[in-house]
Amino acid sequence: MTVRARTHRVIQIGWPEFGQAVYPPPTSSSELQQRVDKLRARMDERKLTHLVVYGDREHFANLAYLTGFDPRFEEALLILSSHGTPLLVVGNECEAYVGVSQLFNEGKLRRERFQPFSLLNQPRDQSRTIREIFAAEGLNAASRVGCVGWKYFSDHEHPNAQYAIELPSYLVDTLREIAGHDRVVNSTDLLMHPGYGLRTVCTPAEIAYFEYTSVQASESVKRMIFGMREGMTDHEVVALGGTCGEPLGCHVTFTTGRTSALGLSGPKDERIVRGQPLSMNLCYWGSNSCRSGWVASSFHDLPVPAADYVAGFAGAYYEVMSEWFALLKPGTPGGQLWRLIRERLPFERFGIFLNPGHLIHLDEWLSSPIYANSDVPLHSGMAIQVDVIPSSPVYASTRMEDGLILADKELRKQLSDAFPDCYARCQKRRKFMTDVLGIELPEEVLPLSNIPAIVPPFFLAPNEVFALEP
């Protein structure tokens, strides 16, 4: 689709209600098994006899994707061979928690306790060594082992990228003692590469869960925006958001006053003061909702150098983001989105340093096809984060960060059949973005947030939001 350049405006609206999402059922054993089978097919293509998938509290997503289990505050390791039932190796306190996995409950996943995966000084005298476990799973000098952690490396990052493995040394050292150094390689890309990683193609079940957490996160941000008042502390504002109990995908951030320049900071007992910039986010597994603006009712409350914040900064950003949305079609090279942002929002003024958009999954940042000269095409099933972060010493920032799904006709039909209420809410959000905000969307774009592209420049006047001229 071609999109004509549009000029921003500020309109007065009541924020729409799109409805609450219902917590979807857990991922079925059949879907989990399909993921394992697909991964085994990739193993076969690379002539791997075994794959080990590591997880801990921070780096859980690959493990959870394959098993429905995350190791909470322990470590865990999935050992997958070319055939047979996979083995999940866990610590003391996760031994019972493995029951969260539908694969395990149906006998399609084995479990073994390896006590060194537990917290320090807990019992460690009732499990085999990791070498014994590996040997029992058939690893030997003839094995070729792929390791999956949380990142892989390019040739310019490491001189021997395929052998650079981020898993704990005590695991990798043991694997290499058994199979040899060159027969143990980094295979994280099989799940995380933006072009072909398995987790870059979401199923209807994943979309329904991501929509659920997106609704929870965005409704919390909405409550914070409408509830904040001058004189409150940042902790008090964050408390207004509330949390639903789902695991967080990253730390809650809230910056203002002395923390304004500390982008990843959480609340630090700063007061809400008129004339200060403010940014906030809440992130669950599969979602992240963030807004940035000013504690103000109008431009009259801003510092004099920032008085043209709407026309000179945030409005221009909104205009270009409408063009960014128009490029969200299967087949668009990621480099085209990067080039749009770099050319239309020059770094010297807008300071956009990170990728202008990335993939999100259970982890807040899966990977990104959007970078300089990227020829990685967007494809159906991608969960894309509208994460384009401007930064200015004068204007601070602005943001419309939420998530969306890129879904072709077939995937939309599957979602509509399996989760009709979820699909209907996505269509309502599309209609609002198009009819009220003036943002033209490709038919493949399914917004997941309940505050889709709603950006108030001044948080003390939240019903005044950006839109585009007709």
Language-model features, listed with the residues they occupy:
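Active-site neighborhoods and metal-handling regions in enzymes and metal-associated proteins
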Residues: 1-470
